[in-house]
Regions:
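Predominantly soluble domains enriched in secretory-pathway, periplasmic, or organellar proteins
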Residues: 9-327
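Bacterial N-terminal signal peptides
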Residues: 1-9
Length: 327
């Protein structure tokens, strides 16, 4: 089990969002998504072969979920008292107890399950399978896959309107696919204007607006009722996650360049980019705690590239960390 500790940021507090704490996790491995538990004070972060669990108030290590090689995401089904991890290298989902974190089983899925989410309307868990280009639909009551939905493209992230529709970013098609969660049929495919390689996706359930973060430094606002592009907004480079705080009406884009783009939703059709708050290079995925209005971003320290052709810089050993961001 990795030991974690918190360091308070030493720089002066600015007028906007800033790093409040840094929670260090000295074990090795890269990461992907992070999630906030809806029933405890824990945050869960994917960490290559395991999921690290931290107390969000102190940064202390609570435990790990082991044997999740290639883990991407974490989802929670509170009514079933279960959590789920998507294990990309294993083509499986690990099921765990939402309070004790004890592993309860493993489910075979499509190839390379990436993002994972629970839809309270259909009472199903969905994995976005990047290699097989489909969704695995899991019944948490039985821990079985009950349907596979072909998407015809690489799914990146999915969100629900909690009223019978699922929206999925199709990264290699620059579109959003709309799935009926009663029939499990793809009903529509919407192009997203100038957006290229959509990754992060969030939704405002009240205004029925989708927020798609794209690889070409744009966030596309889409009407979830008809697919019309409402707004194209500038964001930082390297977005791989989008979060939404329904209470504050803030949309967040976590950018690998080391910034957090903060956008205010003034109304369903009126948006303003407030700032690109400094975070840290590599902080590209995000979890928003709507209870505390804090934001969590995993990243690490990196060595300088030895070869210009090197795709990613080497991660410094023992430097994995979670940034806590707020006002």
């Amino acid at each position: 089990m990795a030991t974690c500790f918190a360091i308070t940021a030493s720089f002066a507090q600015g007028p906007g969002f800033h790093v409040i704490n840094t929670f260090h996790i000295p074990s090795a491995g890269r990461w992907d998504y992070i999630a906030v538990s809806p029933v405890t004070d824990n945050i869960y972060v994917s960490h290559q072969t395991q999921v690290n669990i931290l107390n969000k108030n102190t940064g202390d290590s609570v435990g790990v979920i082991p044997n999740t090689t290639g883990v991407h995401g974490i989802a929670f089904a509170p009514s079933f008292k279960k959590g789920f991890t998507s294990n990309g290298k294993l083509n499986t989902v690990t099921v765990f107890d939402i309070k004790t974190n004890a592993v309860q089983g493993e489910i075979k899925t499509g190839e390379n399950p990436d993002a994972i989410m629970y839809d309270p309307y259909s009472k199903k868990v969905y994995t976005c399978n990047g290699k097989s280009k489909d969704l695995s639909v899991i019944d948490p009551a039985t821990n079985t896959v009950v349907k596979t939905i072909e998407l015809g493209g690489k799914p990146e992230t999915a969100v629900s309107d909690e009223a019978g529709k699922l929206y999925i970013n199709i990264e290699d098609k620059n579109e959003i696919a709309v799935v009926n969660t009663k029939t499990f049929v793809v009903e529509r495919r919407w192009k997203i204007g100038k957006g290229d390689e959509p990754s992060g996706l969030a939704i405002d359930l009240k205004t029925k607006r989708l927020f798609a973060g794209c690889g070409n430094k744009l966030l596309i606002v889409v009407n979830a009722e008809n697919g019309n592009v409402v707004k194209e907004l500038p964001i930082g480079d390297g977005c791989d996650g989008v979060g939404f705080d329904a209470g504050l009406k803030y949309v967040y884009s976590s950018n690998g360049e080391g910034t957090l783009t903060v956008i205010k939703e003034k109304s369903a059709n009126d948006f303003e980019v407030l700032e690109n708050a400094p975070t840290k290079k590599g902080a590209r995925t995000i979890a928003v705690d709507e209870k505390t209005h804090k934001i969590y971003l995993p990243t690490a320290d990196f060595a300088a590239k030895q070869d210009p052709k090197q795709k990613r810089p080497d991660m410094m050993p023992g430097s994995f960390q979670i940034l806590e961001v707020g006002k």
